From Swiss-Prot:
This is Large ribosomal subunit protein uL4. Part of the 50S ribosomal subunit. GO terms for molecular function: rRNA binding; structural constituent of ribosome. Residues 62-73 have a biased composition (Basic residues). GO terms for biological process: translation. It comes from Corynebacterium aurimucosum (strain ATCC 700975 / DSM 44827 / CIP 107346 / CN-1) (Corynebacterium nigricans). GO terms for cellular component: ribonucleoprotein complex; ribosome. Residues 45-102 are annotated as: Disordered. The gene is rplD. Keywords: Ribonucleoprotein, Ribosomal protein, RNA-binding, rRNA-binding. Gene3D superfamilies: 3.40.1370.10.
């Protein structure tokens, strides 16, 4: 494994130096099974889980026996809210529940690094100095810059948390997902065709990831 070097693209179409993508983050083995498990857990955790149907004991009405037990020639009934009645309760219906799954942090990190490595190996990671120069947001400039970087449909833009200018510039662009470095996750990386990092966001992500790895080694 070796560190990958990328040019830092500027809004005027030039380059301003290079950055290194650490091999332990951007050149690891991508396990499809692991990424599948982590993405499934992430999507499950996003489910609201507030579905609910009423049982025969919760439906309004039906407290009185509809007709006497014997002598009518009809099948005996105890309530008009029994499940086989129209308007009756539901049997074995959905109830509120938590769909989240416990996923170890190591698995989450390994899946993310595998997804980023896959994008890096296919030259689908780009690094920019800033999305729009200056302090004035411009959706037009942001759109032109992103289209110059890639012609693929879905783009994941990773920017600094305080980069309000870039966020406002790209917020209305279709098929552009905006995250800060701390929000980067396996699902959004895999869903996107290309990942565009600002220099600030890339440095933040690398520092956090490598710092966490060093702390884990020290604990051992």
């Amino acid at each position: 494994m070796s560190n990958l070097k990328l040019d830092v693209q500027t809004a005027d179409g030039k380059t301003n130096g290079t950055v290194e993508l650490p091999a332990e983050l951007f050149d690891t083995e991508a396990s499809i099974a692991l990424m599948h498990q982590v993405v499934n857990a992430q999507l499950a955790a996003a489910r609201q889980g507030t579905h609910k149907t009423k049982t025969r004991g919760e439906v309004r009405g039906g407290g009185r026996k509809p007709f006497r037990q014997k002598g009518t020639g009809r099948a005996r009934q105890g309530s008009i809210r029994a499940p086989h009645y129209t308007g009756g309760g539901t049997v074995h219906g959905p109830v509120p529940r938590d769909y989240s799954q416990r996923t170890p942090k190591r698995m989450i990190k390994a899946a993310l690094y595998g997804a980023l490595s896959d994008r890096a190996r296919n030259e689908r990671i780009h690094v920019i100095e800033e999305l729009v120069p200056g302090q004035t947001p411009s959706t037009k400039q942001a759109k032109a810059f992103i289209e110059r970087l890639t012609d693929r449909k879905n783009v994941l833009l990773v920017i600094g948390r305080e980069d309000i200018n870039a966020r406002r510039s790209a917020n209305n662009l279709p098929n552009v997902q905006i995250l800060d470095a701390g929000q980067l996750n396996t699902y959004d990386v895999l869903y996107s065709d290309d990942v565009v990092f600002s220099v600030e966001a890339l440095h933040t992500f690398v520092e956090r990831a490598t710092g966490a790895a060093e702390e884990a080694k020290e604990e051992k």
